[in-house]
Swiss-Prot record:
Its cofactor is Mg(2+). It is found in: Cytoplasm, Cytosol. This is Phosphoserine phosphatase. It catalyses: O-phospho-L-serine + H2O = L-serine + phosphate; O-phospho-D-serine + H2O = D-serine + phosphate. The gene is Psph. One of its GO terms (cellular component) is cytosol.
Length: 225
């Protein structure tokens, strides 16, 4: 059993930190915002809640929600232009501080790459450090499904990404930070998990995470000590 002080040391000596995006790096759930924009918010929000609570296999939840939303390429582009995602307070400073320490920062999301890349640009995170789901569109821009080959399209996908990062870059210590069950499941192979409840509290995560925070200032403080 890793103690809290050992977890803090792990975080401060990590060579890579992976963040979930929806309700962690940004305040919103991207798929819920897309559903709201497309007029099917209520049904999709309930599915998101069940998926994040671990009650529904992730790929099933994603397939069902997207079948309801049917987002076109134009709708995704207009969502980003008219309702860009809001960064969680403190995340810009935390990512910047980690990068100053030569820590590699990755975004691993069950959300959509087009939205996550927009967030990555705000945080000076290269697109090569983004792992997320890809929406597919027909030539006329209508919804054509999603890329089911992406590891993030299924339960356990975030762990697969972290395993891939360890094999590719030989990272010794990878930390996963996020609000949901799929984030907590990524440890192991992540060396430590930090639960985040600054935007929404998932009781299962709060009850089981050995380190649970509600403000990124706490992690910034650890790096400054």
């Amino acid at each position: 059993m890793v103690s809290h002080s050992e977890l803090r040391k792990l975080f401060c000596s990590a060579d890579a930190v992976c963040f979930d995006v929806d309700s962690t790096v940004i305040r919103e759930e991207g798929i819920d915002e897309l559903a709201k924009f497309c007029g099917v918010e209520a049904a999709v929000s309930e599915m998101t809640r069940r998926a994040m609570g671990g009650a529904l296999p992730f790929k099933d939840a994603l397939t069902q929600r997207l079948a309801l939303i049917q987002p076109s390429r134009d709708q995704v582009q207009r969502l980003l232009a008219e309702h860009p995602p809001h960064l969680t307070p403190g995340i810009r400073e935390l990512v910047s501080r980690l990068q100053e320490r030569n820590v590699q920062v990755f975004l691993i999301s069950g959300g959509f790459r087009s939205i996550v890349e927009h967030v990555a640009a705000k945080l000076n995170i290269p697109t090569t450090n983004v792992f997320a789901n890809r929406l597919k569109f027909y030539f006329n821009g209508e919804y054509a499904g999603f890329d089911e080959m992406q590891p993030t399209a299924e339960s356990g996908g975030k762990g697969k990404v972290i395993r891939f990062l360890k094999e590719k870059f030989h990272f010794k210590k990878i930390i996963m930070i996020g609000d949901g069950a799929t984030d907590m499941e990524a440890c192991p192979p992540a060396d430590a998990f930090i639960g985040f409840g600054g935007n929404v509290i998932r009781q299962q995560v709060k009850d089981n995470a050995k380190w649970y925070i509600t403000d990124f200032v706490e992690l910034l403080g650890e790096l400054e000590e």
